[in-house]
């Protein structure tokens, strides 16, 4: 399917964001909550890396110059795949690795720490990648700690920060202001004229010993800049929420954060391990165009049903069972991993609701 998209001039080089949640090398077989096989996650490390390399190279080609890719993995393969992505996307285009809390604390672990996290590798195709900085809202505890002062007369909550910054400068910011020089090895953050203007507006606080500090107001803050540890996006089956029944369904709000951060309304989003369709739903709700791909017949059925009927209340048990290799369904890793293989002539069959189904031949 990715080869098919590469041959589509309207798509190739025009995808603005890729999010994928590929198999994790767990050695297990994953079932839907009605015990149908979702996918078989069994492979050798070498086979898995060849599988991923082929797809990552195709995804790199499909991305626009302003595009980004997020790859969701666990500790089994995240560092192996990072080496692949450094090679394909370039080390300079590595933007970060997000650590996500995936489930509640465990008290039944083996002789190790409880495994409650997984990881998201974040790369861009170039330095011009789209980036809408995300912010969390202030909570009362953080507000009281970070903005402890109330301005007389206005009641505006604020904090007080130095008027200087590290490093020496030539010119006005390195010279005196009101008879004071900046501390050794530092410079004024603003010119003397700008500091006078701020002082006239009441934006400078003078301490009892005559030390000036700049007021930073809470009502001018966009929020708390998001860091690379995410604690609020547990998997759906670890929350009191609705789900599709797909065993590795991800958190809708997490996908919305990623999509809002690295794309704009009208942009094209791709998920080629679409699974439960969460990426597609998030993209639809945020006004993005989207393409979803999955090799699993059950995944396609779940996605179609989700768009028609939504999700269902949690309650049924979703299992992951390790089984012998006796499945009638084909494993993801039974495919040919040859880099040079061209699957652009895949046989297409029509689907029921604005979908195209592709069959490997």
Where are these regions (language model features)?
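Cysteine-dependent PTP/DSP-like catalytic domain, specifically the C-terminal lobe
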Residues: 107, 294-361
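Short non-domain terminal segments
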Residues: 120, 147, 188, 215, ...
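Low-complexity, compositionally biased segments
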Residues: 77-79, 89, 121, 256, ...
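Class I S-adenosyl-L-methionine
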Residues: 1-268, 300
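Conserved S-adenosyl-L-methionine
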Residues: 45, 78, 251-326
């Amino acid at each position: 399917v990715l080869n098919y998209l590469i041959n589509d001039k309207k798509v190739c080089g025009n995808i603005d964001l890729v999010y994928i949640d590929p198999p994790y090398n767990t050695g297990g077989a994953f079932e839907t909550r009605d015990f149908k096989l979702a996918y078989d996650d069994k492979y050798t490390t070498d086979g898995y890396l060849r599988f991923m390399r082929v797809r990552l190279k195709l995804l790199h080609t499909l991305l626009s110059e302003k595009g980004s890719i997020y790859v969701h993995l666990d500790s089994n393969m995240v560092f192996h795949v990072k080496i692949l992505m450094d090679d394909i996307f370039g080390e300079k285009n590595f933007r970060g690795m997000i650590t996500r809390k995936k489930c509640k604390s465990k008290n039944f672990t083996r002789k190790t720490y409880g495994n409650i996290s997984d990881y998201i590798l974040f790369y861009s195709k170039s330095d011009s990648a789209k980036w809408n900085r995300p912010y969390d809202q202030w909570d009362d505890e953080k507000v009281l700690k970070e903005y402890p002062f109330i301005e007389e007369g206005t009641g505006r909550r604020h904090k007080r920060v130095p008027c200087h910054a590290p490093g020496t400068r030539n010119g006005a910011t390195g010279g005196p202001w009101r008879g004071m020089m900046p501390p050794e090895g530092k410079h004024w953050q603003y010119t003397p004229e700008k500091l006078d203007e701020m002082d006239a507006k009441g934006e400078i606080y003078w301490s009892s010993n005559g030390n000036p500090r700049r007021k930073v107001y809470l009502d001018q803050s966009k929020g708390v800049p998001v860091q690379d540890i995410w604690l609020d996006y547990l998997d759906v089956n670890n929350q009191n929420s609705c789900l599709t029944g797909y065993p590795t369904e991800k958190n809708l709000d997490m996908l919305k954060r990623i999509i809002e951060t690295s794309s704009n309304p009208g942009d094209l989003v791709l998920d080629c391990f679409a699974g439960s369709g969460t990426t597609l739903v998030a993209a639809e709700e945020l006004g993005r165009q989207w393409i979803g791909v999955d090799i699993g017949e059950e995944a396609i059925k779940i996605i179609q049903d989700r768009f028609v009927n939504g999700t269902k209340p949690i309650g049924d048990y979703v299992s992951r069972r390790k089984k012998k290799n006796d499945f009638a369904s084909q494993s993801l890793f039974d495919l040919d991993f040859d880099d040079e293989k061209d699957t652009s002539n895949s046989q297409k069959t029509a689907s029921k609701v604005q979908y195209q189904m592709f069959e490997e031949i």
